Amino acid sequence: MEAFVVRGGRKLEGTIRVDGAKNAALPILAASVLTEETVVLQGVPMISDVRKMTDILTMLGCRIRRDGHTLTLDAGGLNRTEMPDALSKQIRSSIFLLGPILSRFRQATVTYPGGCEIGLRPIDLHLSGLRSLGVVIHEEGGVIHCDGGNMHSGEVHLDYPSVGATENILMAAVLLPGISVIHNAAREPEIVDLANFINAMGGSVRGAGSAVMTIEGVKRLHGVQWTPMPDRIVAGTLLAAGAITGGTIELTRAPVQALLAVNAKLREMGCDVREEEKRVILTAPERLTAFAQLQTQPYPGFPTDMQVQMLALLSVSEGTGVVVENVFENRFTHAGDLNRMGARILCSGRTAVVRGVPELYGARVTARDLRGGAALTLAGLKAQGETQVDGAELIDRGYEHFETQLTCLGADIRRVHANA
């Protein structure tokens, strides 16, 4: 097990470039198998989830060459439709391959995917959407067998605007003759990026970013060179690091439009946030002011992936604030660790009430998922003394060299091997 050891008390200051988005890169990697031609992806974050996804693609027969943050993929030799069990269980994004493989080969087999333990994230919406496109699905012993021999275009009505289901159905439909429509589609910017990527390969997707997406099937897709969008959650986390330490942070290559909900909350807490073209500049007060309430929502609402970071900020703010988690039911698991550091957080169901305290104190805490681990690291930046965040490898799932980024901004943080 690895851990971050953080000594708090330093204001973070400086300029940092935002990495490519994990939640854009993973579905785009999956969509790369829709063509037999070469795809070049630039600016790909070299995080553990991306490495595992490329391992899965390689085992399926895809040839991949890595040069720094550039991946060159050739899926022309893809020859397997059954995804490797062990790797699929480690990474939830393996489910993204279901749609593209069905589209290419009209059959696919996948085990139930893994990922962070942040509550139930059923894939029933993925499967019901694929059934609407004519896929016959048989589930047995945690294995999903899909027969797409009679796949056809169609109308898909999602009960909830699921990001993953929207992306999977989009990728499954792109090579089907006729017109498919996704109703109640998710609107996240990463979906827009995926649709733009597919269109750049010769696809015909309209309405991405709205509640109704239309996919007109094409016969084939060609190769392309593409750069995934910058990561709005990494950007928000870095801004939160500046805010909790009373510092000044400038982000370059920032996804400004995608950060509006986060920036609005930071302003409520007393931060000065300036938004320019591809830049965000935050200047934080000595002590933050608690916002009255935050509710997570699908985009363009406040992102659930930034909720626990804001919980850390709220814990040292002046006043009392309420956080309501509407997306996942198990996302306050790190409140106990923050309380161990001196926070005053009371959780009940999907609601957390936070009474701000003047100081946090270093402690040994444990990351249980990647966003919670990042939030505990932020708390350590503010705390008096030394904080050890066990489970740094979980943070690596979504942040590339997180400790290096924070060190560049002035943090005292190092990675160590830790005993359980």
Regions found by a protein language model. Give the residues of each.
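Short, structured segments at the rim of ligand-binding sites
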Residues: M1-A420
